[in-house]
Amino acid sequence: MQRLQVVLGHLRGPADSGWMPQAAPCLSGAPQASAADVVVVHGRRTAICRAGRGGFKDTTPDELLSAVMTAVLKDVNLRPEQLGDICVGNVLQPGAGAIMARIAQFLSDIPETVPLSTVNRQCSSGLQAVASIAGGIRNGSYDIGMACGVESMSLADRGNPGNITSRLMEKEKARDCLIPMGITSENVAERFGISREKQDTFALASQQKAARAQSKGCFQAEIVPVTTTVHDDKGTKRSITVTQDEGIRPSTTMEGLAKLKPAFKKDGSTTAGNSSQVSDGAAAILLARRSKAEELGLPILGVLRSYAVVGVPPDIMGIGPAYAIPVALQKAGLTVSDVDIFEINEAFASQAAYCVEKLRLPPEKVNPLGGAVALGHPLGCTGARQVITLLNELKRRGKRAYGVVSMCIGTGMGAAAVFEYPGN
């Protein structure tokens, strides 16, 4: 019945402000550990760098991907040939980066006998890779797999939608798929009353939380140092080692944010300061069937309890998490109050703030280490990065707990996954 109510809510559409998504209560208590559980063994990511001007501006995505693939296997001392499959999320490379990702595999000394695929569900591609590998484990295709995400927004063509029929003009929703993301942010702000001040307040909080987390070293366990080469304007090359996220601005103030001009619309409220940053980065996550992880003596960082993806109107795609999270919680038998951390991608402060309000999430539970406004949003990488950040933060806290990863998706979707940290 609850699932039906959620689906009916989708059909009524977001304009129905009277609808409040609710997850079904947990009737049987916390899930019991099962040998068939899909568990997260380990995950690492690169630092996230500013596209076009940061430490990875001249680094190809296969190199970024290889760095995290190699680190994850080395950290847990797993032989590469023990992998049953690899899935890589990517948005901007041709063919979702299928050739690039296979090259990264070989750069990481993972043998050709290990298969690989790539997936593009836009901003949720990294999380979709996790879901794809989890599906293979659940259906018995293999016991261990690697889910990754990578994006070089420095080196990719971001403005080409590909070969599209002129008939799209005949269908409103088809046309809406080509609306610039910044305009969808403005649509959310206008239709749901998310003011410029509210967006800037959200953005400031993201920067402050990320700066505090970085100063405390909270990201160190996640980040793989990457030594690479950068070229200056004169063509001079130099070697650098990138060890920390570049987009965090500790000196951000409300006054500074208020001075920024609208980025997408003359009288708009979405600015460079309250939007996610264009970024480069990669992440890799090792998943396994619990029984296999225990057999090999591998650590268990978390358990994937549910995954959901839903559709929403393309012109307000940013509302996706507000519709995906209730479905994922319902699948896991949980409510909002059962969750300690919500990692919601901050594509834009407008849509993130809307989702927090719509779901009535306690602000202190949302992105406690900051989000994409401060850290950046390398499209294919983000979902995997969020999983790693979430589970490492739950590990720092120590107790058994649940966390949610969610994001909006261009062309009108939302994805969400529920993870359990088993406790120290």
Curated annotation (Swiss-Prot):
The active site is at C123, H377, C408. The modification Phosphothreonine is found at T59, T60. One of its GO terms (biological process) is fatty acid beta-oxidation using acyl-CoA oxidase. This is 3-ketoacyl-CoA thiolase, peroxisomal. Homodimer. Interacts (via PTS2-type peroxisomal targeting signal region) with PEX7; leading to its translocation into peroxisomes. It comes from Homo sapiens (Human). GO terms for cellular component: cytosol; extracellular region; membrane; peroxisomal matrix; peroxisome; specific granule lumen. The lineage of its organism: Eukaryota, Metazoa, Chordata, Craniata, Vertebrata. Changing V6D: Abolished localization to peroxisomes. The PTS2-type peroxisomal targeting signal, which mediates interaction with PEX7 and localization to peroxisomes, is cleaved following import into peroxisomes.
